[in-house]
């Protein structure tokens, strides 16, 4: 694999411009806006930096492969060709997320099943050991997006959605996700206000 990787960062719709600026400041290059996402290239160090410091992204996806598909079998074969031993031990756990439709795949559950089957079949080639499925806390989370006959296969570097920072084990329900709250502050010019010595009090800030 090369030293630079294609990355997709997902976000709530309408925050693409803010995320584009934030990700550029964190080192993402050749960044472009998409619907509810941005796309760019970066070294792995930058990918980890985005996972750690982005306040606006939901997920950071590292693109492993793009390939055309005509039907479910070509989807399976395309995923099977990836060297999954580089990413997961045969006795590890995985979760698969699938979005999009077309090329004979009109059900996301069926598409995810074909992706899962290909990964499992690849990993059990060595000695028959196969990974388990864990949708809550997998060792590897894979995402495949189907767009007009092209499959975009990615590793989810962020695990859980990045708005779930998890530093508080007990929390009450909040009206805003943390990344959306951060976007509201940016739109309101809070960084400038704070730099000028301004103060902010929010007695209903949820997890902060």
Predicted regions and their residues:
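Residues forming well-ordered secondary-structure scaffolds
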Residues: 110, 114, 118, 137-139, ...
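Short, flexible active-site-adjacent loop segments at beta-strand->alpha-helix junctions, enriched
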Residues: 100-102, 150, 157-159
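C-terminal edge-of-domain segments
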Residues: 142-153
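Conserved S-adenosyl-L-methionine
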Residues: 181-208
């Amino acid at each position: 694999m090369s030293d630079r990787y294609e990355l997709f960062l997902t976000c709530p719709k309408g925050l693409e411009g803010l995320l584009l600026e934030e990700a550029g400041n964190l080192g993402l290059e050749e960044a472009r806006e998409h619907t509810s996402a941005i796309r760019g290239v970066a070294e792995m160090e930058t990918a980890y930096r985005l996972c750690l410091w982005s306040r606006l992204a939901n997920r950071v996806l590292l693109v492993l492969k793009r390939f055309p598909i005509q039907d479910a079998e070509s989807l399976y074969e395309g995923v099977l060709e990836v060297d999954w031993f580089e990413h997961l031990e045969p006795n590890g756990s995985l979760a698969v997320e699938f979005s999009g439709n077309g090329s004979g795949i009109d059900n996301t559950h069926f598409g995810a099943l074909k992706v899962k089957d290909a990964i499992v079949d690849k990993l059990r080639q060595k000695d028959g050991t196969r990974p388990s499925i864990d949708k809550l806390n997998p060792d590897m989370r894979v995402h495949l997006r189907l767009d007009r006959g092209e499959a975009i296969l990615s590793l989810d570097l962020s695990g859980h959605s990045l708005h779930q920072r998890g530093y508080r084990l007990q929390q009450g329900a909040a009206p805003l996700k943390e990344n959306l709250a951060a976007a509201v502050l940016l739109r309101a010019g809070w960084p400038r206000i704070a730099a000028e010595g301004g103060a902010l009090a929010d007695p209903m800030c949820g997890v902060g």
